[in-house]
Design a protein with these regions (language model features):
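Sec-dependent bacterial lipoprotein signal peptides
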Residues: 1-19
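Extracytoplasmic cysteine-anchoring/structural motifs
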Residues: 20-365
Length: 365
C-alpha cells in the first residue's frame, strides 16, 4: 500500500476555572467564568492518502517526497468554534523544510466541536481566485482572518487554484501547497486528535527505456486533459480506512468534487539522447491540479481513456492512455514508464501517493 498521512496530535490538558485560581485573571479575560479551557498541543506528521478507484503500484512500496519543495516550509492552524468565531489563527515558519512538527500549544475552550483548518506553504506563488473572479495572494487573505472575527467559511471553501495557458504549478522555489479541514471534538479531559494534511497537486514523472535496435532522440512530452482550476481545500471529499500489510491504517479517497473547468494539454520541450538498451528519466517532474476529466468518444464515455500522455521521439508523437487512472485526485504521483521497441511502444503506469521521509542532517533548503 502506498501511504500518506499528515497526523496532528492534540494533547489536551483540561483545567476547570474553579480549580485554577492562579489562572483566574487569564480565564476571565478569555471568556465566561464557568468555561472549561483546554491546552491543545499540536503535532504534525506526514502520512498517506490514496484514491480508491486507482490501481496502485505493485507491492507496499512507499513514495518519498523527492525534494524539499514537497515538504512543509510553513504551517498555519486556524481553530473555529461552533458559532463560527475564530478562536486561533497562528502562522508558523520553519527554519528548514519539515515532514514532522509538534508541541505547538493552543488554549481553546473545551466541550465544543471545533473546525481546524490547516494550510502549509501558503507563501507559494499559486494563483488563487475567489468565486467572483478576484485574484489575490493566499497568505494575505489568511492574514485578514483575525481572532474573534467570524470565519469566512463560504469564501474560503470556494477559493480555487488556477492555471493559465499551458502552464503547470510552479513549486520551485515556491513549495507545493497543502491544506485540509477537520472536525475535532474537544472535551474536558486529556485527548488526542489524529489529523492529516494533503498536497493540493498531482505530480507526473516519466521514465523512458530504449529497447529498439537504434539510438533515439526524445524531444519532450505532453500531458493531456489537465484541469485549469481546482478547489484550494479538498471539497466534499470522503475517505475510508485501509489496513496496510504492516498493520498500519491509512486513508483512501473514495470521492471528491471539482469545479466546472476547462482542460488543456501541457507540453514540455527538451532534447534527450537515448542510446539503445538505456533508460533515462525526463527531468524535471511536473505538477498539476486534481481533476475529473471524462473521455467521450464515438462509443460514449470510456474511463480507460480519461487521461493520456504523449512522448515525442525523433520528431514523431507516441501517445498512450493511462488506463488505470479514471480520475486524478490531489496528492497523487503518476509515474509513467515508456519502453520503445522496434515496432511498438509499451506503456506502464504506477500511481503512488507520497509518504513520510526521514530527514538526514544535510537535508533541507
Amino acid at each position: 500500500m502506498n501511504k500518506f498521512v499528515y497526523i496532528i496530535l492534540f494533547s489536551s490538558v483540561v483545567c476547570l476555572l474553579s480549580a485554577c485560581g492562579s489562572d483566574k485573571e487569564e480565564m476571565s479575560r478569555l471568556g465566561d467564568d464557568d468555561a472549561v479551557w483546554v491546552n491543545l498541543d499540536i503535532n504534525v506528521s506526514l502520512t498517506d492518502v490514496m484514491h480508491s478507484g486507482i490501481t496502485r503500484a505493485e507491492g507496499d512500496g512507499y513514495e518519498n517526497a523527492a525534494n524539499g519543495y514537497e515538504l512543509m516550509s510553513t504551517l498555519r492552524v486556524i481553530v473555529v468554534r461552533p458559532d463560527n468565531t475564530v478562536e486561533e489563527n497562528r502562522f508558523i515558519s520553519f527554519r528548514d523544510v519539515l515532514q514532522h512538527y509538534g508541541d505547538e500549544r493552543f488554549k481553546v475552550r473545551g466541550r465544543e466541536t471545533k473546525r481546524v483548518y490547516l494550510f502549509a506553504n501558503e507563501n507559494s506563488s499559486i494563483d488563487i481566485q475567489s468565486e467572483d473572479g478576484t485574484r489575490f495572494r493566499l497568505k494575505e487573505e489568511l492574514e485578514r482572518i483575525k481572532k474573534g472575527d467570524a470565519f469566512p467559511t463560504e469564501t474560503i471553501g470556494k477559493l480555487t487554484v488556477n492555471l493559465d495557458g499551458g502552464n503547470q504549478l510552479k513549486v520551485n522555489p515556491n513549495y507545493v501547497p497543502m491544506n485540509e479541514c477537520h472536525t475535532v471534538e474537544v472535551g474536558d479531559t486529556d485527548q488526542k486528535a489524529d489529523l492529516f494534511i494533503i498536497r493540493a497537486a498531482v505530480k507526473y514523472s516519466f521514465y523512458v527505456k530504449n529497447e529498439s535496435s537504434h539510438a533515439k532522440t526524445v524531444t519532450g512530452y505532453s500531458v493531456h486533459n489537465m484541469a485549469r482550476q481546482a478547489y484550494l481545500l479538498p471539497r466534499d471529499v470522503r475517505y475510508r480506512d485501509v489496513e496496510g500489510s504492516d498493520g498500519t491504517i491509512y486513508k483512501e479517497i473514495e470521492a471528491f468534487e471539482v469545479p466546472e473547468t476547462e482542460y488543456y494539454t501541457y507540453r514540455f520541450n527538451a532534447s534527450y539522447s537515448l542510446p539503445k538498451n538505456k533508460e533515462i528519466i525526463l527531468a524535471p517532474s511536473c505538477y498539476f491540479l486534481e481533476g475529473k476529466h471524462v473521455y467521450e468518444g464515438e462509443g460514449g464515455a470510456d474511463e480507460k481513456k480519461n487521461y493520456s500522455v504523449s512522448l515525442w521521439v525523433d520528431g514523431a508523437e507516441l501517445k498512450g492512455f493511462l488506463e488505470n487512472v479514471p480520475q486524478l485526485p490531489r496528492n497523487t504521483h503518476v509515474k509513467v514508464y515508456i519502453t520503445i521497441k522496434n515496432t511498438s511502444t509499451d506503456w506502464k503506469v504506477d500511481v503512488r501517493p507520497y509518504t513520510e521521509v526521514p530527514l538526514e542532517p544535510d537535508f533541507g533548503l
